[in-house]
Curated annotation (Swiss-Prot):
Domain of life, source organism: Bacteria
Database matches in PANTHER family: ANTITOXIN HICB (PTHR34504:SF4)
Lineage: Bacteria, Bacillati, Cyanobacteriota, Cyanophyceae, Synechococcales
GO biological process, one term: regulation of DNA-templated transcription
Listed name of the protein: UPF0150 protein ssr1258
Species per Swiss-Prot/TrEMBL record: Synechocystis sp. (strain ATCC 27184 / PCC 6803 / Kazusa)
Pfam families registered for this protein in UniProt: HicB_lk_antitox (PF15919)
Family the entry assigns: Belongs to the UPF0150 family.
Record's signal peptide: none
Length: 69
């Protein structure tokens, strides 16, 4: 199986838990008490997400922009 590359957006909530989201895969989220734990968990979630969808339905991650209002 070919390796695929995904980006993970990481935030920390008010309780100090790290939350990760994969923008290329809809509804692909996980969390962990450390970034290492989050990354291990998100790998498992990505594998599950890929089993549920066809590769053509993934979107291409373009980037992140900051907006000041």
């Amino acid at each position: 199986m070919n390796k695929q590359e995904f980006y993970v957006l990481i935030e920390r909530d008010e309780d100090g838990i790290y939350i990760g989201e994969v923008p290329q895969l809809k509804a692909c989220y996980s969390q962990g008490e450390t970034i290492d734990e989050l990354m291990q968990n998100i790998r498992e979630v990505i594998e599950l997400c890929l089993e549920e969808i066809e590769l053509e339905s993934t979107s291409e991650f373009i980037g992140i922009q900051k907006v000041v209002v």
